[in-house]
């Protein structure tokens, strides 16, 4: 059913261009309504149609990592479902896992609008949302209600960010506060110290500050939930090595590479039409195709420096099966995407999943784990 709509998706993108944030919120609310009504005859039928259109079953892509089962390696990146209101639906759209948030301990409205811009010539998005969300306590309530109605049938992660009002020297307590509310509502957690849209946040990637955050979180992590750190694509090698060392010291599950970039050097867009300003003057992080190669480069660097012993979730600029494959052979065990999903619609997930299966067949590999880091073997 939904495959019949694919030719019309560019029209949807065009219609939503004037208000991308509003269109996205409308989509999330629609998915939330579907989740709430899934037990009805009509809702159950719609979910079955989603499953038929977007879910691909391939045992060669199934992995168990950190005690969690991933039916395929393609996950939803943080930033899409900030409040977790569609948490019960992402599995029906073909994702192997989903990361919710970013969420902060304290509710915050984010930055002034407009704050989300599509750069179609670059297949990119400029976002300066500012971690707008209702706070960790409300998200915990939302997810508890969803899990009562819908099974948690894919691994769910939550991206934790520091509240804007919290001083940098109190960041550790802020992250722990969010974790305490949400610990029972997700399968893994991510320490976001790399968003460019919270003042000073990126400084928390530095050794001493990140050390205190990870130490506090692991002390609070009584159930040993897998804990990751998400890093910036703008880091130099020395800074990445420091984070690798801390990740190993604090027994992190892995590293997510990477978040958005503040660099503008790979953009063809020079003027932001919505404001008339030069793109270099516009605050915010760039996601999508412009960070594809840099994120893949960092994945390879981490894999080589850790000899493949620290798992990597690769994210940034995935639009095609080749993009996904290149991150896997560079060293990523799992993948995430969001911007590609916006530009190409939900069909991108089954396309990539099938494409990964085709790659395995071409190389005579029997399982996706055999391809991880194969560039360095």
UniProtKB/Swiss-Prot annotation:
Keywords, comma-separated and alphabetical: Cell membrane, Flavoprotein, FMN, Membrane, Oxidoreductase, Pyrimidine biosynthesis
Which EC class is the enzyme in? Answer: oxidoreductase
Q: Which Pfam families match?
A: DHO_dh
Cofactor(s) the record lists? FMN
- Which cell locations does it reside in? Cell membrane
**What is the membrane topology here?**
Peripheral membrane protein
**Residues that coordinate or bind substrate:** 82, 127-130, 192, 197, 259-260
Q: Which residues form the active site?
A: 195
Q: Which reaction does it catalyse?
A: (S)-dihydroorotate + a quinone = orotate + a quinol
| EC number(s) stated in the UniProt entry for this protein | 1.3.5.2
Predominant cellular place of this UniProt entry's protein: membrane
- Kindly list the biological process annotations in GO that this record carries: 'de novo' pyrimidine nucleobase biosynthetic process; 'de novo' UMP biosynthetic process
- Its pathway? Pyrimidine metabolism; UMP biosynthesis via de novo pathway; orotate from (S)-dihydroorotate (quinone route): step 1/1
CC cofactor note: Binds 1 FMN per subunit.
Amino acids binding FMN:
78-82, 102, 159, 192, 230, 258, 288, 317, 338-339
UniProt record similarity statement: Belongs to the dihydroorotate dehydrogenase family. Type 2 subfamily.
Q: How does it assemble?
A: Monomer.
This protein is called Dihydroorotate dehydrogenase (quinone)
């Amino acid at each position: 059913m939904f495959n019949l709509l694919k030719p019309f998706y560019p029209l949807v993108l065009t219609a939503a261009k004037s208000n991308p944030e509003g269109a996205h919120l409308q989509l999330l609310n629609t998915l939330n309504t579907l989740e709430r009504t899934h037990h009805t005859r009509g809702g159950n039928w719609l979910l079955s149609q989603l499953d038929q259109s977007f879910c691909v079953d391939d045992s060669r892509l199934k992995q168990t990592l950190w005690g969690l089962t991933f039916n395929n390696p393609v996950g939803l990146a943080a930033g899409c479902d900030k409040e977790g209101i569609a948490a019960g639906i992402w599995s029906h759209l073909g994702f192997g896992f989903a990361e919710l948030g970013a969420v902060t301990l304290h509710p915050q409205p984010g930055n002034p609008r407009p704050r989300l811009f599509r750069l179609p010539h670059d297949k990119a998005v400029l976002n300066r949302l500012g971690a707008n969300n209702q706070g960790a306590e409300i998200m915990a309530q939302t997810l508890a209600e969803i899990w009562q109605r819908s099974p948690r049938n894919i691994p769910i992660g939550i991206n934790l960010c520091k509240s804007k009002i919290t001083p940098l020297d109190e960041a550790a307590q802020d992250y722990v506060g969010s974790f305490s509310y949400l610990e029972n509502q997700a399968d893994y957690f991510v320490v976001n110290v790399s968003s460019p849209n919270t003042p000073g946040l990126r400084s928390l990637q530095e050794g001493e500050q990140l050390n205190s955050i990870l130490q506090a979180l692991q002390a609070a992590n009584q159930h040993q939930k897998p804990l990751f750190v998400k890093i910036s694509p703008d880091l130099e090698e020395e800074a990445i090595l420091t984070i690798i060392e801390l990740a190993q010291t604090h027994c992190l599950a892995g590293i997510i590479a990477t978040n958005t970039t503040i660099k503008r050097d790979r953009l063809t867009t020079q003027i932001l039409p919505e404001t008339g300003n030069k793109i270099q003057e516009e605050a915010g992080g760039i996601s999508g195709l412009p960070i594809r190669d840099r994120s893949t480069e960092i994945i390879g660097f981490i894999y080589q420096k850790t000899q493949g012993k620290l798992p990597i979730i690769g994210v940034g600029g995935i639009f095609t099966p080749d993009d996904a494959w290149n991150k896997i052979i560079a060293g990523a065990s799992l993948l995430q995407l969001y911007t590609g999903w916006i530009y190409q619609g939900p069909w991108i997930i089954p396309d990539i999943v099938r494409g990964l299966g085709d790659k395995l067949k071409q190389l005579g590999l029997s399982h996706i784990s055999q391809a991880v880091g194969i560039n360095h073997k």
